Structures are given as C-alpha cells and as structure tokens.
Amino acid sequence: TLLASSAASDVYKRQSLYCGIDPTGDSMHIGHLIPFMILKRFQLAGHHPVILIGGGTGAIGDPSGRTTERVLQTADQVKHNADSLTEQMKKLFGEDGSFTMMNNYDWLSKISLLDFLRDYGKLFNINTMLAKDVVASRLETGISFTEFSYQILQSIDYKMLYEKCGVQLQIGGADQGGNITNGIELIRKTNENHEAFGLTIPLMLKADGTKF
C-alpha cells in the first residue's frame, strides 16, 4: 500500500492537493459538498489545498454523468460564474494564504491547436480514451470532439499544478476516476521522477440516481 511503502516523514509532511470546479453555474451546489469538505479537512490538518476554477474547461463542458451534449456558455457567462465561485471559495477556505486559487484558463487559453496536438495529443491513446466510462456510455448517442477532448484538458491541469505548485494529489468524484488517472499517466510520461496520486469519493446523487 501507499502508506506501507512510505517513510514516516513522507506520511506526515505537508502536502499540496487540489480539487477543481467548472463554472457551469454562479454558485456551488450540494453535489460539491463532499469533495470540498474533504479538501477543507486537509487544510485544517495543515496541508495546502489548491482550488482550480475551470475557466478553460468550463468553456468546453465536462461530459461526465451526462447523456446529451452540454449547451456552451458565452465567455461572459463563464467569467461571471468563475468570479462568483472564487468569492465563495474565499469564504469557505479563508484569505490567510493557507490555500491557493487558480484558473485553468490562464494556461489552457495559451495552448495553440498545433501545440495541443503535438505536445499532448501524441501522449494519449484513443483506444484507452474510448474505454473510459464517460465516453463509452455516450458512443451510441454521440459525443462531440469538443467533449471527447475534455479529459485531455483536465490531464493538462494536473500536469501544470504538479510542475508549478508541487501538487501530488487530485481529489474528485467517483465519476472523475478516468480523468484523474489520465492526468497521473500524463505526469508519468512527462516527468522522470513522478509521484502523483488520485483520490475519488462517492457522489452525492439526487433521489433518481442522477448528479446534481
């Protein structure tokens, strides 16, 4: 196990970890409760949480848990929602410097199409991507290249935070397991000494079993 193979100094040292939230609305909802409660507990235990606002990925739309294509928001809507979520996160995590707030628009918007295909597309296997539950469940009804590419963008997020902020753990709902492992694999392929991990947690669902 991870703990069994770790030295005591590794287990107790201060860790940086992150959880992302796409600005699909201007407020958190009950479905965000569990992952951000866990992130808050890490903060209270002395670790450093990084909250990633998906200004870039939110402009694309996460296909997880959906049977139909998302309606794309305008750039103004995404920015408004991102700003609103940022203020909510400050209230939850404080403004004492014990956490970091970032927006993936800052790096995703700077990647050209050619760089995306050359630097990242070559590192992802289509067969593996098609096998992910979120994609496989949409093959019959159809999924656009836009939403199909979402998992690559989220992987880039983990790589960027790993390299820039020393983040070694990503927290996400159970439906994000495939995206998280993609990010870990991208880090493995692009960093010689890599230590990146993922933690998935049960989803809080509606009475009919669908996501909030």
Residue spans for each PLM region:
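N-terminal catalytic cores of NTP/NDP-binding nucleotidyl/phosphoryl-transfer enzymes
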Residues: K13-P63, Q170-G177
